[in-house]
From Swiss-Prot:
Organism expressing this protein natively: Enterobacteria phage T4 (Bacteriophage T4)
Record protein name field: Sliding clamp
Gene Ontology MF annotations: DNA polymerase processivity factor activity
A UniProt-annotated Pfam family: DNA_PPF
Disulfide bonds listed in the record: none
Keywords from the UniProt entry: DNA replication, Viral DNA replication, Viral transcription
The keyword Cell cycle is annotated on this UniProt entry: no
Keyword Lipid biosynthesis belongs to the record: no
Length: 228
């Protein structure tokens, strides 16, 4: 099999969520954070030929970048990963699947309680402003008929009362109120446009970012509130 630049870019992104990955035969990849706060999945154009666990995904991708784009990836007789181009061959150790935290199957997302969108340029601004202003927490809430993201520094403002950044996403025609809290450390998605689905029931809640190339599900923080 061969991995295109688009697939390797996705895998590099997934490595920011979990340093290891379990690749399974087919055209679907997925991962989740060790603490379970973030899940990501994607359909890819390449076909994965065999099941294999990779403990150090960034290390594997780094080695893969050193060979030609036409390098062939296969499974060696001893179960490890063989990377070969016209002149060189590299053997990368496969991991014991039990050492890699990975989802057993795709995680279904419930029917959304609220839906909006976040544009690529807005997501990029949010991430950049958050770094510049030390914003570690965002709250997705309703204000005057609009769905709004507010940014806070929870370390210095544990009650989240001092807004450091605000971004209006779109109109909200529902009657419910909510204040969904997300840790910025879990915002690992690739740059792009996303449909944002918000769900909550009781003390549980999650936000799903549906993109052109990948989907991400992020758990809401325990101090989130809603009346759904």
């Amino acid at each position: 099999m061969k991995l295109s630049k688009d697939t390797t870019a996705l895998l590099k992104n997934f490595a920011t969520i979990n340093s290891g990955i379990m690749l399974k035969s087919g055209q679907f990849i997925m991962t989740r954070a060790v603490n379970g706060t973030t899940y990501a999945e994607a359909n890819i154009s390449d076909v994965i030929d065999f099941d294999v666990a990779i403990y150090d995904l960034n290390g594997f991708l780094g080695i893969l970048s050193l060979v030609n784009d036409d390098a062939e990836i296969s499974q060696s007789e001893d179960g490890n990963i063989k990377i070969a181009d016209a002149r060189s061959t590299i053997f990368w150790p496969a991991a014991d699947p039990s050492t890699v935290v990975a989802p057993n199957k795709p995680i279904p997302f419930p029917v959304a309680s609220a839906v909006t969108e976040i544009k690529a340029e807005d997501l990029q601004q949010l991430l950049r402003v958050s770094r510049g202003l030390q914003i570690d927490t965002i709250a997705i809430t309703v204000k005057e008929g609009k769905i709004v993201i507010n940014g806070f520094n929870k370390v210095e403002d544990s009650a989240l009362t001092r807004v450091k950044y605000s971004l209006t996403l779109g109109d909200y025609d529902g009657e419910n109120t909510f204040n969904f809290i997300i840790n910025m450390a879990n915002m690992k998605m690739q740059p792009g446009n996303y449909k944002l689905l918000l769900w909550a029931k009781g003390k549980q809640g999650a936000a799903k970012f549906e993109g052109e190339h990948a989907n991400y599900v992020v758990a809401l923080e325990a101090d989130s509130t809603h009346d759904f």
